[in-house]
Amino acid sequence: MCCWPLLLLWGLLPGTAAGGSGRTYPHRTLLDSEGKYWLGWSQRGSQIAFRLQVRTAGYVGFGFSPTGAMASADIVVGGVAHGRPYLQDYFTNANRELKKDAQQDYHLEYAMENSTHTIIEFTRELHTCDINDKSITDSTVRVIWAYHHEDAGEAGPKYHDSNRGTKSLRLLNPEKTSVLSTALPYFDLVNQDVPIPNKDTTYWCQMFKIPVFQEKHHVIKVEPVIQRGHESLVHHILLYQCSNNFNDSVLESGHECYHPNMPDAFLTCETVIFAWAIGGEGFSYPPHVGLSLGTPLDPHYVLLEVHYDNPTYEEGLIDNSGLRLFYTMDIRKYDAGVIEAGLWVSLFHTIPPGMPEFQSEGHCTLECLEEALEAEKPSGIHVFAVLLHAHLAGRGIRLRHFRKGKEMKLLAYDDDFDFNFQEFQYLKEEQTILPGDNLITECRYNTKDRAEMTWGGLSTRSEMCLSYLLYYPRINLTRCASIPDIMEQLQFIGVKEIYRPVTTWPFIIKSPKQYKNLSFMDAMNKFKWTKKEGLSFNKLVLSLPVNVRCSKTDNAEWSIQGMTALPPDIERPYKAEPLVCGTSSSSSLHRDFSINLLVCLLLLSCTLSTKSL
């Protein structure tokens, strides 16, 4: 008669398989290519909850890794064995050895198993302050996953063989609350049978005509249309507004971008109106903002620029990828704009070889923002999303914001940047940019495995340092960037004089003797770079005057364009709030202890009752 209370209490213990947790998971993604491993997640204050649904009757593994490999990873393993759920917190050391974590920070909420699938739901704190756990921030996380047909035993989980993988995600991207109709009209801007050359990098440009609208419409969602099997080939897509002074003859055929023989019409396409990069999904504008079409100020012709990345020089590739734009006649309050901020893509952007860390900065200067905003919108513009962009050497990007010498909260950041995963970050709160503010796109690179200089450029082996700001209301400012002074960079390696007038590119060194008649690129590569020299060079570059780029639509420029400016004096750097360690571990232990104590008391009560009979 005393056994039934124990069974009831067992159903109350954490990890019971009695039923679902009742939680909702607004974010969901497939981790494998066969539809076997689904991940759902949801942030709740200082905690994050996960739901794993996997086609297996054995254990399920999940975790976070600094590189996507098993070394130095934060791992949790769970399942249902003999009708009883389990969940264990593990970690791996630098040698990929799996060890049980002394501080168990993952807490089982629900587990279920049937003949084909296992479902596990669990929570953890964003910041556990356990050295073996990965803190979860707004940055990219490299999720690792695995499963096995057998459950984990007392000795730990068996090796998962090929049932494993990795995927980069941003777990704390704010939820998109607006629900869009599935019947929205759309049009496609998609390349037709583009032959991809057998070289590592190709930029392909094709002009399109926007459908003719008799009245104003708003684009409210943009999705990538990537040809199946080309997910790693198509690295990023930019959509530019072109001059409206054309006829349809410009639509006849595409051409390789930035090529001497490309059509002159392409040169009028300077205003970025949308950007997508590898790993990103569709983008929905906020409920009060849309991309305007149908008015005289809106694009009639656009240029689709697709960056193809073919590092294996594969031959015979034909691509049909592009963008799909969903639109509505239900006009929203504001028109969206895009500002490209950061380092102007140029050979003057230099990164020495062999550097475990090197920092570059691109300045959207107060002079440019002062002139453009005072003329267009003195009350300021409101940023609601940011795309951070770099290439293979990129390790971290931050978009910093300054006002009158004071550093504001970061507009956007990704301290674990992944070249293969770049998407717009929705800001948790819209941020206002005022006349006279400064923006700095700060990029961190690693060139330890490179023997020669890395230059700013279009190739994925070259580098970029850019931020694309989505904002409203739209103003006539499309690019706010900078170029560092090259002569002072060359003086660092001992260059004294170049041949003038400059008639070749890259230009040629005249003196000293060791660099005579070398291009400035060859001279920089000839210099004997050490880590110490690289650090000194980095300090110099960050202090150099910059050439201002401040562009309007239709290749027009603000008057500040081409002038020289100094990096801002930062009187009051931003102090981020310290991370607060979660308490779920202690509260869970207290809860478990209380329930176990109650179980013991009931057992004792049953025993005494039996003896008294």
From Swiss-Prot:
Annotated compartments: Endoplasmic reticulum membrane
Residues annotated as the enzyme's active site: 203, 389
Top-level taxon of the source organism: Eukaryota
Residues binding Cu cation B: 389, 391, 464
Database matches in InterPro entries: Cu2_ascorb_mOase-like_C, Cu2_ascorb_mOase_N, Cu2_ascorb_mOase_N_sf, Cu2_monoox_C, DBH-like, DOH_DOMON, DOMON_domain, PHM/PNGase_F_dom_sf
Any single biological process term in GO: norepinephrine biosynthetic process
Keyword vocabulary terms for this entry: Copper, Disulfide bond, Endoplasmic reticulum, Glycoprotein, Membrane, Metal-binding, Monooxygenase, Oxidoreductase, Signal, Transmembrane, Transmembrane helix
A Gene Ontology cellular-component term: secretory granule membrane
Entry's family note: Belongs to the copper type II ascorbate-dependent monooxygenase family.
Annotated PANTHER family: DBH-LIKE MONOOXYGENASE PROTEIN 1, DOPAMINE BETA HYDROXYLASE RELATED
Protein name (Swiss-Prot/TrEMBL): DBH-like monooxygenase protein 1
